[in-house]
C-alpha cells in the first residue's frame, strides 16, 4: 500500500494530470502485476482471468514507447500470437493494464477512508453477502411496502465515460479510454448498440466493471443526497457493488450535489422510514408509509435515469408490492414479511378479554423452481427435477466425481442455510446425490441399484446430508436439542463474498 502512495505522490508532484503518464511507467505495471496476484482484503476481482505475465507486460511497455504504438494495422491480425502479436490480444493486455492503473488512486482513497472511520478490522465481515440479511431482518419487519428496482444498463459506453469525467480531469487519459471503446466497436461492427455493452462486459470485464461501478455510484450519490435532505434521520443503507466489493462505501466521496438544484424536488419526499439495499444491478427500497410515496420515488428514479444519465427505463422495471402479501426475490432468496397471529386471554376481575397479537417476522425461503432450473441448465436434472447423470464427468475417477458433487452441495448448503425452511434445500441435496450415483453408475456401465449393491457407496454418499451437521457440531454443543434448533433457525455466514452460478439465477 505504501509503495502505491509513494509512486503516486511522485507523479502527482510532476503534473496535475497524472493518470495518463502512469500508464507508460514500467514500475507501475510491475506494481499492478504484484497488486493483482497479492490481493488485500479490500479487493475482489471476481470473474477476472489474468492471462498476462510480468515478461509480457515488460515487452508491452517497450512497444508502447515506440512510435505509433497504438496504431495496429489490419495485417497484424493474421500474425502468429507466439511469433508476433495478435491485435485482439494486444488490445486486451493494454485494456487490463489500463484498468488496473485507473483503480489504484480509488483504491487508496477507499483504504484511507476506512482507516479514518476505524472499521478496517470489521470490514472483512461487512463484505459478506450474508451480512445483508441480518440488516433486512432488523429493519424490514417494521415496513409495509417494498419496491423491487432493477438498475438499467446504459445503452452506450460513452455514457459511462461521461460520468467518469466528473472525477478525472485528464484529457489524454480519456483519449486513450475512447480508443479502447472505438477499437472494440470497430472490431465488433456487426453487433448492435443494444448488445455492444453486454459484449464489452464479457471481453473487457475489469474495465467495464470499473466504469459501471462509477455509474451506479453516481446514481446512488444523488439518491443518498435527496434522502438525507428530506429527513432529519440518518439514512439506513447497505450496498455491495456489482461483482466488485472493492468499491464498498465509495459513495461517501462522490460528486457533491447542491440543494438549490433540487429545491422543488425535496418537497415530494418526506419519509423518515425508508431503507435501501443493493447488490449488483438490483436494489430494494422499502418504506412504512403509503404506496403514494413509493410511486413518487419510482417516477423519480425513472426521470433520473432518463434525464441525467440518458438511460431509458420502463416503469415496469420497478415493482411496488405490500410486504405482507408479496415476496421479493433478492440474492437468491424469496423473502416476505409473515404475520404470526396469536390470541391471549386476559381476565380483569370478572371480565375476560381475548387479545389478538400480531408479530411480524421476515420469512426467507429457498426458491426451489429457479434452483431446479439452474440445475437443469447445468445438466444435473431435467426441468421437472428428475436427476440425470453428468456424462461429461464420467472420465474422471470415482473420488473426483464424488468430490465435485460434494463441493457443489457444500456450497449450496453453505449459502442457503439462512433459509427459514430447509425442506427445499434437502430436495436440492437429494437431486445432487442421485445425480452423483447415476454418474458413477454410467461410468461403470451399470444400473444404479447394481452399482450401489456392488460398491457399497451408499454410506459414503450420506455425506450429502451429514457434512453440514458435523461442521455445526464443532461450533455448537453436540446435543440433539441444539442441532434441532439449528435446523429450524437461520444461520448466516460472514465468509461468502459472492454467489456462484447456481445461486445467481436471477
From Swiss-Prot:
InterPro entries: Domain_X (IPR024937), Maturase_MatK (IPR002866), Maturase_MatK_N (IPR024942). It comes from the Eukaryota. Pfam families: Intron_maturas2, MatK_N. Its main location: plastid. GO terms for cellular component: chloroplast. The keyword Lyase does not apply. GO terms for molecular function: RNA binding. One of its GO terms (biological process) is RNA splicing. Signal peptide: none annotated. Keywords: Chloroplast, mRNA processing, Plastid, RNA-binding, tRNA processing. PANTHER family: MATURASE K. Belongs to the intron maturase 2 family. MatK subfamily. Usually encoded in the trnK tRNA gene intron. Probably assists in splicing its own and other chloroplast group II introns. This is Maturase K. It comes from Wisteria frutescens (American wisteria). The gene is matK.
Amino acid at each position: 500500500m505504501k509503495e502505491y502512495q509513494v509512486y503516486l505522490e511522485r507523479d502527482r508532484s510532476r503534473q496535475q494530470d497524472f493518470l495518463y503518464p502512469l500508464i507508460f511507467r514500467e514500475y507501475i505495471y510491475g506494481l499492478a502485476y504484484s497488486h493483482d496476484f497479492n490481493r488485500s482484503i479490500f479487493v475482489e476481482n471476481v470473474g477476472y482471468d489474468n492471462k498476462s505475465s510480468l515478461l509480457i507486460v515488460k515487452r508491452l511497455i517497450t512497444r508502447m514507447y515506440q512510435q505509433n504504438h497504438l496504431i495496429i494495422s489490419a495485417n497484424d491480425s493474421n500474425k502468429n500470437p507466439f511469433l508476433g502479436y495478435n491485435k485482439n490480444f494486444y488490445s486486451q493486455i493494454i485494456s487490463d493494464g489500463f484498468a488496473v492503473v485507473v483503480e489504484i488512486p480509488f483504491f487508496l482513497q477507499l483504504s484511507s477512508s476506512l482507516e479514518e472511520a476505524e472499521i478496517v478490522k470489521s470490514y472483512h465481515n461487512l463484505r459478506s453477502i450474508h451480512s445483508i440479511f441480518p440488516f433486512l431482518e432488523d429493519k424490514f419487519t417494521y415496513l409495509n411496502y417494498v419496491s423491487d428496482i432493477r438498475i438499467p444498463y446504459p445503452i452506450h459506453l460513452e455514457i459511462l465515460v461521461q460520468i467518469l469525467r466528473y472525477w478525472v480531469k485528464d484529457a489524454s487519459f480519456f483519449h486513450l479510454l475512447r480508443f479502447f471503446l472505438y477499437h472494440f466497436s470497430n472490431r465488433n461492427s456487426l453487433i448492435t448498440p443494444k448488445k455492444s455493452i453486454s459484449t464489452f462486459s464479457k471481453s473487457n470485464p475489469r474495465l467495464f466493471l470499473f466504469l459501471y461501478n462509477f455509474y451506479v455510484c453516481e446514481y446512488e450519490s444523488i439518491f443518498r443526497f435527496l434522502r438525507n435532505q428530506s429527513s432529519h434521520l440518518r439514512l439506513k443503507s447497505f450496498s455491495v457493488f456489482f461483482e466488485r466489493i472493492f468499491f464498498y462505501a465509495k459513495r461517501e466521496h462522490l460528486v457533491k450535489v447542491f440543494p438549490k438544484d433540487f429545491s422543488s424536488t425535496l418537497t415530494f419526499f418526506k419519509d423518515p422510514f425508508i431503507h435501501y439495499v443493493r447488490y449488483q444491478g438490483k436494489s430494494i427500497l422499502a418504506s412504512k408509509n403509503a404506496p403514494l410515496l413509493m410511486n413518487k420515488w419510482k417516477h423519480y428514479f425513472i426521470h433520473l435515469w432518463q434525464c441525467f444519465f440518458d438511460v431509458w427505463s420502463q416503469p415496469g422495471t420497478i415493482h411496488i408490492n405490500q410486504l405482507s402479501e408479496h415476496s421479493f426475490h433478492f440474492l437468491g432468496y424469496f423473502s416476505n414479511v409473515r404475520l404470526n397471529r396469536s390470541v391471549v386471554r386476559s381476565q380483569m376481575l370478572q371480565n375476560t378479554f381475548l387479545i389478538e397479537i400480531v408479530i411480524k417476522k421476515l420469512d426467507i425461503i429457498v426458491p426451489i423452481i429457479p434452483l431446479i432450473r439452474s440445475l437443469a441448465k447445468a445438466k444435473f436434472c431435467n426441468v421437472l427435477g428428475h436427476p440425470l447423470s453428468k456424462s461429461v464427468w464420467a472420465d474422471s475417477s470415482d473420488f473426483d466425481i464424488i468430490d465435485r458433487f460434494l463441493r457443489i452441495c457444500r456450497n449450496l448448503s453453505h449459502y442457503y442455510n439462512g433459509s427459514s425452511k430447509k425442506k427445499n434445500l434437502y430436495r436440492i441435496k437429494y437431486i445432487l446425490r442421485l445425480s452423483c450415483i447415476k454418474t458413477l453408475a454410467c461410468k461403470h456401465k451399470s444400473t444404479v441399484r447394481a452399482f450401489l449393491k456392488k460398491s457399497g457407496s451408499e454410506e459414503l454418499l450420506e455425506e450429502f446430508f451429514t457434512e453440514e451437521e458435523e461442521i455445526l457440531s464443532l461450533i455448537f454443543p453436540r446435543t440433539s436439542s441444539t442441532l434441532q434448533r439449528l435446523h429450524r433457525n437461520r444461520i448466516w455466514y460472514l465468509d461468502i463474498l459472492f454467489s456462484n452460478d447456481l445461486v445467481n439465477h436471477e
